[in-house]
């Protein structure tokens, strides 16, 4: 485990880079399903990396040190700000344990709360959840979660659950002053008033690698999606080439005339169409084998698996039939459905 005793910012940045590698690289102890997904860090608005010591005898006390960084508007990472963590917990625990923590700040407001106030209490106004694991995890998992903060904890080299509710991230002002050679607040550091320090080069190298991995994964997912759509398009049966056409152009309807209102409809009740179709005294039901997205007014949209009531049909399955679904009436390719 890494040293939880507070040290200078250069050492804290070096420790943070080491911890991030341990949390994100596949090893004999960390399989592909036991690493922080690249997209979680690539999409983070901020992150904190710390080493924590927990001691307990009836009541547990937690303390440690690390750094916090924020995502700048241009997508780059800010300079690091030194932080500490402190908290108390209940439960009958006896002993001492050292853990490494990675805390992901998913929303700007979580970063701002720390930057403006100089500390951030986990829980309360900010929901805390154990972060997702797994290299192949879909990138939208973090988007589906409403948690403002993700936490990852490793104890003795293994991921472990840890409750950080009520723990507080605290700004270490004196450590920042010594490193940056000026009185400077976390707010100014995290919002880009100082450049990335050369002493933290290793840290930025690994942080930038997550963005590259995420973009590579995104390209791979997009390529798979395109290939899947192309295969699906090839598998779809061709639509009938000819559509039922109106025998005359639409007439101007008189709002007060019910007979005029029924005189013209886009597809149903056209004499030229019904000469070759059969109106069904007992409507039959068909099930969609494929999804169909209409391309012209009067087409009936449906998804694979939908049940459609057939209003009128021809003897050919390679033709346009008329049906009704969810209160909508329109025509559809008959070879996209099967009889129930």
UniProtKB/Swiss-Prot annotation:
GO terms for molecular function: phosphatase binding; phosphatidylinositol binding. It holds the Pfam family SH3_9. It comes from the Eukaryota. Keywords: SH3 domain. Gene3D superfamilies: SH3 Domains. The keyword Lipid biosynthesis does not apply. Residues 224-259 are annotated as: Disordered. GO terms for cellular component: ruffle membrane. SUPFAM superfamilies: SH3-domain (SSF50044). Residues 281-340 form the SH3 domain. Residues 226-237 have a biased composition (Basic and acidic residues). CDD domains: SH3_SH3YL1_like (cd11841), SYLF_SH3YL1_like (cd11525). GO terms for biological process: phosphatidylinositol biosynthetic process; regulation of ruffle assembly. Residues 238-249 have a biased composition (Pro residues). InterPro entries: SH3-like_dom_sf (IPR036028), SH3_domain (IPR001452), SH3_domain_YSC84-like (IPR051702), SH3YL1_SH3 (IPR035511), SYLF_SH3YL1-like (IPR033643), Ysc84_actin-binding (IPR007461). Belongs to the SH3YL1 family. Interacts with SH3D19. This is SH3 domain-containing YSC84-like protein 1. It comes from Rattus norvegicus (Rat). The gene is Sh3yl1.
